[in-house]
Design a protein with these regions (language model features):
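Acidic, glycine/proline-rich low-complexity segments that act as flexible tails and inter-domain linkers
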Residues: 1-38, 49-51, 55-58, 65-66, ...
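Short, structured motif recognition centered on aromatic/hydrophobic residues
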Residues: 40-47, 77-78, 156-164, 195
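A broadly conserved amphipathic alpha-helix scaffold signal in soluble, globular proteins
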Residues: 62, 79-82, 95-98, 196
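Alpha-helical oligomerization segments
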Residues: 187-215
Length: 215
């Protein structure tokens, strides 16, 4: 079990709360069916959703780096999440990453579009029947990021599932991202652990997500 970053600081804030927080931290980091990178991405994604970009983000960045998550992977996670959590919060998040000493971005290449396939293509096709303009916007956003290097499709889908749980988008968005995760190797056990891990950021939301996923 990894040492939780920031534990001593929490004790200084409130010793009883620190014990409670350590318990939920060990719950997440002890889950067997998520990789250490994925556990870090759960935390870093939830930080954008609420948002809490002060001490919690600092603790989660430290935990990610101490578990061999590359700084550029943290950046890529946040690039990926922009259309899901909203571009404006990412401006503040990248400012905070700079303040926390994360190295400057290594990737400055022009963003390329990769044609969508499979579940993503079907989602855009279905959306076009509702609103063609929105479908075109969504297609561009998806084509810009799902095939980029630095994160696997499974990692990207898991991060999007965290957003779905936090924002309670438990219909077609949740189903799409669960299908993408499964197509990239995730199992029901993976999804169960994900929902259990996200419970740290809002228990009742995880209850609803578990029911929506049929877990």
């Amino acid at each position: 079990m990894p040492q939780l970053a920031g534990a001593e600081a929490l004790v200084r804030l409130d010793p009883v709360f620190a014990q409670l927080a350590a318990g939920v931290g060990h719950n997440l980091w002890g889950l067997a069916h998520l990789t250490m990178r994925e556990k870090a991405f759960v935390c870093l994604t939830a930080d954008l959703c609420h948002p809490h970009l002060d001490v919690p983000l600092a603790m989660h960045v430290q935990m990610a780096l101490s578990n061999q998550v590359e700084p550029e992977a943290i950046r890529e996670l946040y690039r990926h999440l922009a259309p899901y959590v909203g571009y404006p919060i990412l401006v503040t998040a990248f400012q905070r990453l700079a303040e926390l000493g994360l190295p400057e971005a290594r990737d400055d290449k022009p963003v390329e579009l990769t044609p969508l396939r499979g579940e993503l293509a079907r989602a855009v096709h279905d959306l076009a029947a509702v609103d063609q303009g929105l479908a075109e916007f969504s297609e561009e956003q998806l084509a810009q990021r799902w095939a980029r290097p630095g994160l696997s499709v499974r990692e990207r889908a898991i991060a999007c599932l965290v957003v779905d749980v936090c924002y309670q988008t438990l219909g077609e968005s949740l189903r799409l991202h669960a299908a993408l995760a499964r197509s990239a190797g995730a199992t029901d056990d993976t999804l169960r652990d994900l929902v259990r891990g996200v419970a740290e950021f809002g228990m009742a939301r995880s209850w609803a997500a578990a029911r929506a996923l049929g877990l």
